[in-house]
A protein has these predicted regions:
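Bacterial lipoprotein signal-peptidase II cleavage site
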Residues: 5-21
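Glycine-centered loop/turn positions within well-structured domains
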Residues: 7, 131, 208
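Short linear motifs in intrinsically disordered/low-complexity regions
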Residues: 15, 19-20, 137, 217, ...
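Short, glycine-/small- and polar/acidic-enriched structural segments
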Residues: 23, 30-184, 191, 198-204, ...
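Pocket-lining segment of extracytoplasmic ligand-binding domains
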Residues: 108-110, 181, 186-271
Length: 271
């Protein structure tokens, strides 16, 4: 808050011949600047707005959303939330473009579509370490080099593709050196466990299922932790560009709810 300050006092002039001293200029109080009001937050609607929020079936995607829901943050900011499950980020963005989803969580790979202008990142979710490339030793895959010429399942446009390319790079291999088998993220686990592919690139909880099912036959060839010096696996919450432009108050309220959920996660992790 601005505080009024006293102006400097006037000084005496040289005494005239009759030794009369001119009066000092009286001190004057400067006009106080008006207090600057804090910017008003978004207006909370009197009735809850129904919104659809897309997620993927893993901890990273759900943790903040569930925390926001469980602590009442969504209701506090005026939302009645319907959660809708998807297998991957690109599919989510396609659904958003059709108007069936309002907000969503995406992993690293789908950020390419944001760069292309198809969606806007509205807030940071977290850094991920859930992606991995897994080989099946029964299929002759023990090292990254063994992937050459092998069938490797991945999901295009997702963090699955990102971790696969990074892992191949460790052995100076590219996608052209393998038999890349593109498939829906939800189908990768079944293909890997059934032996239809020799290796795969996927994320949690698919990775956990594969390790449990294959046991000692599963070998990790690459993971996020191997590339922290060159790659960052970022997850974010997104909205459509038109919504960000035309419904800014609602977007801000959604972000506030997400950050409330994130704060709860950070301070009450055990819950």
């Amino acid at each position: 808050m601005a505080v009024g300050m006293l102006a400097g006092c006037g000084s005496k002039t040289n005494a005239p011949a009759d030794n009369q001293v001119k009066e000092e200029t009286p001190a004057t109080e400067a006009t106080a600047e008006p207090a600057t009001e804090e910017a008003a937050g978004p207006e909370i609607p009197t009735e809850l707005e129904h919104i659809k929020v897309a997620y993927m079936p893993n901890y990273a995607s759900l943790a903040t959303i569930v925390a926001a829901e469980g602590t009442g943050a969504f209701e506090k900011y005026g939302f009645d939330v319907e959660l809708v499950e998807f297998a991957d980020g690109p599919t989510i963005i396609s659904a958003m473009e059709s108007g069936s989803i309002d907000y969503a969580y995406i992993g690293t790979g789908a950020h390419k579509l944001c760069v292309q202008g198809r969606a806007d990142v509205i807030c940071f979710a977290q850094l991920s370490n859930a992606d991995a490339v897994i080989g099946n030793t029964d299929m002759g895959v023990n090292t990254v080099e063994d992937l050459k010429g092998k069938k490797v399942a991945y999901s295009s446009g997702t963090s699955s593709e990102e971790i696969l390319k990074a892992t191949l790079g460790k052995a100076n291999l590219t996608m052209d050196d393998i038999e890349a088998v593109e498939m829906d993220a939800s189908a990768i686990t079944t293909a890997m466990v059934s032996g239809k592919v020799d290796a795969c690139a996927t994320w949690s909880p698919n990775t956990l299922t594969i390790y449990n099912e294959l046991g000692d036959k599963a070998v990790e060839l690459g993971a996020n932790k191997d590339f922290t010096d060159t790659n960052v696996s970022v997850s974010s919450f997104i909205a459509m560009p038109d919504k960000v432009k035309n419904d800014r108050d609602q977007v801000i309220r959604f972000v506030e709810a997400m950050y409330a959920g994130s704060d709860f996660r950070n301070t009450d992790f055990d819950q």
